[in-house]
Amino acid sequence: MSPARWDLPPELCCRPMAFVALTGLDVVYNAIHRAIWDAFCANRRADRVPISFKVLPGDHEYPKCRTKRTSYEWYIPKGILKTGWMNKHLNLVPALVVLFYELDWDDPQWKEKQSECATKVEIVRTSLQGRNTKVAVVLIQKKTPLPPGEDLVASERASALCGACDLSGKSLFVLPHTDHLVGYIIRLENAFYEHAQTYYYNEIRRVKSHKEFLNKTTHQLLFVRHQFKMGFFSELKQDTQNALKYYRTAYSLVHELRAHETNVLEIKTMAGFINYKICRLCFQHNTPLDAIAQFRKHIDLCKKKIGSAELAFEHTAWMSKQFQSFGDLFDEAIKLGLTAIQTQNPGFYYQQAAYYAQERKQQAGQLCSHEPGVGYPAPDPLETTSGALDFYGQRPWRQGHQSIDPPDSEKEKQGILALQVKERDVLHSELIIALLSNAVAQFKKYKCPRMKSHLMVQMGEEYYHAKDYTKALKLLDYVMCDYRTERWWSLLTSIVCTALKCSYLMGQVKDYITYSMELVGRASILSEEQKSRIEKNLIKVLMNEVPEPEPDCDPVSVKAAQSLWSDRVSLAGNNEFTIDVQDYVPFVQCKAKFLSPSFHIDEPVQLHVYVRADCPHPVRFSKLCVSLSNQEYNQYCLLEDAYKGKDILEPSSQENMCLVPGKTRKYCFNFVAKTEDVGKKIEITSVGLMLGRETGRYVYLNWRGGWGDAASSHESLQASRSFKRRTRLPEQHVDWDAVSVQSSTMIISRVPKISVQLTHEPPALTNEMFCMTVTIKSEEDTVGKDIKLTAGLKPGQDANLTQSTQITLNGSEVCDDSHPALLPDIPLGDLQPGQKIVKPLYIRCVSTGSRIFLFHVAYSVSATVEGKDITCKCHKDETVTVETVVPFEVAMKFVSSKFEHLERVYVDIPFLLMMDILSASPWPIELVESEVQLASSMTAIDQPQSQVEGVTLQTSECASECFLLKCPPVQNGTSTVASGHYIISWKRKSTFTETSVVRTVITLPHVMVENIPLYVHAEVPSFGRVRESLPVRYHLENRTGLVQDVEISVEPSDAFMFSGLKQVRMRILPGAEQEMLYNFYPLMAGYQVLPQLNINLLRFPNISSQLLRRFLPSRIFVKPQGRNGDASIEAA
């Protein structure tokens, strides 16, 4: 029985489209006709109407229409649906026949061609005798027709042609062969589509009209048939909603049929067809839940309709095909835009289809295992006269039989036998693998890794049963990683057993060794007997012998495998294998560890390797080697059996090279590190354990990183989380779970035996030469040679700090930018035991902030390790954080002679520069000297001398000094000029060390200088006395090149009487000076306001009187009158 027998017919699975036949086109020899045909069928877009076109000759014979039945009273149907009915209406019986005929309206032979066209139409009608198929005529014309109504000749001849051909006006079309051919074709298609819809509508009505003649006693099959036909015609009409309604009715009716062994296959077949149509339309209507519900209902209704027990495999084959077909529909809908999810995707249906295919295989094995003498029956009961069945789902030897009992029991037996024999020849594994492959692809697409792995295991097992061991092993090996990672030990054991059988039957030595080691180990759930058998086979392979066959293997395959293994044994080469155990769970475990995360160069590096076996019997290894990142040390980490030629089963002279099951062996290695490895990490790259002999066959178990297989990480985690109290083991025994892994170690320098002391007085002051004394004292037993000091700013800090820090050994010189921030490798010579070296360093910090300074002392000493003389390089680092602060803050301001703040100064008018020095240092500061370097735009009235020289300031104390200055004339009326620099020489007062003088230069602020036209100043005594005359002389100096007209008035004061001009107007020549004398008579004692002088410059109205008199004193101290005037005057 061919698998194709269960495939759905292609006419059921395709999308039904209206069938339109085109006649009168010579597409081979006529280029115009070919262009018309290409426009109809080539590169059709999705938005064009769904029509299936076919070019047929004009005299084509269409299927004959049977005589219509007038009564169904005595009619008994022989089946539900004929096998050729769907194809007939899809490809054989057209809804419309279109006759193409070349004829122009102005053709000179119009009459003859009109008659010829009518004849061709009549021929088509004759061939369609009894059919309701429409006929239409398309005139192929060379000219573009005029708009309707304008060409009277065309209208008349069109009417005449319709009359001659017996056509309605809607069935006659004109097709001009112009550049716009495709546009005309699309318009024709739309018209053809309307005619086709009318045809299928009439067909539905015709089928529906039969219902009144039917009864439910004898015509149950016809009810199903008619509903199916109406649904199919509705699909051809593209009325999918009504089609779904008819199909649902048909599905209900098909399950109302009385089922028995002779017709159950036909019922299931038609139910499957109708279910397929319903599900397809539900997906098409974007109602996937309805499709799924319908399919589940379909399976529930049909899964128990098995039929003949002798043909039970047919039922499982049919069930498998149902799931596969629905999976195909689901997948097709997804490709068209439907969204699926993890829990509902086509993979589940393909998986179920594979399950039924596996059941089919199992049932076929039970039902089709005939005796060797039983062959295929003759004559063939499955042959039919036509080569095909008349009705879907019927038996070839009893077509049309609808009664409960078979007509001929002998034929029934022969037919069943023929089906069983054909089923025996079916390659079930191929069917199962194809379905599982589809399911795996879907679960991979929807990210269901466990489902994917599960099905891949089934595929591997199916390949194994199909004797395709290569593919089976490839698939099983792929999924083993997942099961190892997730620790499904029972599943993994089953998979590895199958893989072991495959590797044995293929003669794959390495795979056989690998899987044997895993099945013998702790992850396997096999019994001790099975493990023991596998271990013995493993030892045989390592001894280059042929292993015993695995149980339950195909005898023919075993025989071939034994021949393969014999060839493997006879081969001299290819006997060395390496297995990376990280991907497996072998029966040997390993942990390698350094005893410390770091070792000093003057002590040996110690390494322990722990090995444990989980196999049933003791096993001996021949070599254990540790590979380190520095391969020069590998020679010290090697354990080898001295007697390499001995047999693997013979006892070894080295007892510790035999691994006893469940007992942990410890192997110790040590070596002396090289001095050039100081500061480097040494890592365990791998540990190798050799089973077998180099003279024969051997396998290297390789642990990358020195420990661990596919199960070790989880076991270590479980052990660390366990609250189980560990039993105390004897001293010589090792608790495997208590062994931790240390796969790398650092070689560090020898512990230095020197002391480094730093002496300094923090914080550092900006720009000073900050002294830091380094004292190095030796505590070594031998001479420290080649001592070098690296001192300065610790690397890795802010780049700005590096640029603003300088260090030197010479404290007498001031550092500049040429000095580095770090002095490397300062040679200090040798250091005897107990000797001390003192080294002062001077650091200049230009900016404030916190800095970390490093003092690195390196030297070398001689030492003996494990009898080897080595030179050890030692070093000691000391760091210190030093804060840098400003020593003082300088406040500068310009004031007038009355000590009023000035925002601007005036040409040749004296003013004061005030300097306030506030100490911010926690240490006393001595001000050695100060000076003012004036710019050319400013001069001193007298020789400026330092007023703070020798002053010592404590924290927060302030020293002040002032300088009397004036500005010479400027070019413009107003300008901003530089003042110069203020230079302070200072030093820290320290009892710790002699400090150097620091010279700090401070830039004085710029000041705005203005010219003033009239300078007014006064000569006033330092004080006055009540009721005594107080002479005041005012000087008015013209500073311009113009004659100044000046108005002067005196505002009286309540505290004074005065004599002199109260109001005067005068003229002052350029550069001249005018004096005015007043006698003031004080009336009250104390600080009194002098009478104010109001000055008005007529040539400079913008100059205010207030500006001019700011240079004049406004108050004076008046003493009270004494009892003895002379004595008081002398006292004053």
Swiss-Prot record:
Keywords: ER-Golgi transport, Golgi apparatus, Transport. Its main location: Golgi. InterPro entries: TPC11, TRAPPC11_C. Disruption phenotype: Pronounced hepatomegaly accompanied by lipid accumulation in the liver. It is found in: Golgi apparatus; Golgi apparatus, cis-Golgi network. Coiled coil: none annotated. One of its GO terms (cellular component) is Golgi apparatus. It comes from the Eukaryota. GO terms for biological process: Golgi organization; lipid homeostasis; liver development; protein N-linked glycosylation; protein secretion; regulation of response to endoplasmic reticulum stress; retina development in camera-type eye; vesicle-mediated transport. Pfam families: Foie-gras_1, Gryzun-like. Belongs to the TRAPPC11 family. Involved in endoplasmic reticulum to Golgi apparatus trafficking at a very early stage. Component of the multisubunit TRAPP (transport protein particle) complex. This is Trafficking protein particle complex subunit 11. It comes from Danio rerio. The gene is trappc11.
